[in-house]
UniProtKB/Swiss-Prot annotation:
<feature type="compositionally biased region" description="Polar residues">
    <location>
        <begin position="178"/>
        <end position="196"/>
    </location>
</feature>
<feature type="region of interest" description="Disordered">
    <location>
        <begin position="140"/>
        <end position="225"/>
    </location>
</feature>
<feature type="compositionally biased region" description="Low complexity">
    <location>
        <begin position="155"/>
        <end position="170"/>
    </location>
</feature>
<dbReference type="GO" id="GO:0043589">
    <property type="term" value="P:skin morphogenesis"/>
</dbReference>
<dbReference type="GO" id="GO:0005576">
    <property type="term" value="C:extracellular region"/>
</dbReference>
<feature type="compositionally biased region" description="Low complexity">
    <location>
        <begin position="202"/>
        <end position="211"/>
    </location>
</feature>
<comment type="function">
    <text>Important for the epidermal barrier integrity.</text>
</comment>
<dbReference type="InterPro" id="IPR026087">
    <property type="entry name" value="Corneodesmosin"/>
</dbReference>
<keyword id="KW-0964">Secreted</keyword>
<dbReference type="GO" id="GO:0098609">
    <property type="term" value="P:cell-cell adhesion"/>
</dbReference>
<dbReference type="GO" id="GO:0042803">
    <property type="term" value="F:protein homodimerization activity"/>
</dbReference>
<protein>
    <recommendedName>
        <fullName>Corneodesmosin</fullName>
    </recommendedName>
</protein>
């Protein structure tokens, strides 16, 4: 479909605030637009509740589906491994939230991908977050060196944006490795927040296979790793 407008912030309810454009021009399948924000279809605001029999409200891009089914059929992060040993848990508080693709300064990783600022993402070293990450201002972000400058994203898989360490449904949170991690210095992913696979009823369920690999010679070359 068409590209989404820039995502400027993520609120505590998990919606994406956008600037410019119209809902008709920027909606992609599976997303809905309301009050200047984009939501997965089936996620409705307090101001726009679902009324009467199940169906598509006037502002929806399609029929309602569960958030779990939406994210399991539209994976945000590629699954590189089915082994839970490749998922590193961390007790660190700061986090980078992996969000659906937007065009707000996020570029594909690789040669020539430079210019944008954000959580540092260096070639071969994964993602390094900073305690000064801000979700609303670029002044706290620092650019990366070498080939890729963050935030960056493999084409079609998503984008990185600074946010809080909220574990609400649909978000994949990469945390810096800490004392509890088995691979200090590499991106970590909280197993409890790996909710990409829909359960029998479509509700999000932990999916250890949607984890991050340690960076190095065995890495697939994609970020996150």
């Amino acid at each position: 479909g068409k590209p989404c407008p820039p995502i400027t912030s993520v609120d505590k309810f998990g919606s994406y605030e956008v600037v410019g454009g119209s809902s008709d021009s920027y909606l992609v399948p599976g997303m809905t637009y309301s009050g200047g924000k984009i939501y997965p279809v089936g996620y409705f605001t307090k101001d726009n509740p679902v009324k009467g029999s199940p169906g598509a409200p006037s502002f929806a891009a399609g029929p309602p589906i569960s958030e779990g089914k939406y994210f399991s059929s539209n994976p945000i992060i590629p699954s590189h491994s089915s082994s839970s040993s490749n998922i590193y848990q961390s007790g660190a508080s700061s986090a980078i939230v992996f969000q659906p693709v937007g065009s707000g300064g996020v570029q594909p990783c690789g040669v020539g991908s430079s210019g944008s600022k954000g959580p540092c993402s260096l070639s071969g070293s994964g993602v390094h977050s900073s305690s000064s990450i801000s979700s609303s201002s670029g002044s706290s972000f620092h650019p990366c060196g070498t080939v890729s400058q963050g935030p960056c994203s493999p084409p079609g898989t998503g984008s990185f944006s600074g946010s809080s360490s909220s574990k609400s449904g649909g978000k994949i949170i990469l945390q810096p490795c800490g004392s509890k991690s088995s691979s200090s210095g590499h991106p970590c992913i909280s197993v409890s927040s790996s909710t990409l696979s829909g359960g029998p009823d479509g509700s999000p369920q932990p999916d250890p296979s949607a984890g991050a690999k340690p960076c190095g010679s065995g890495s697939s070359g994609k970020i996150p790793c």
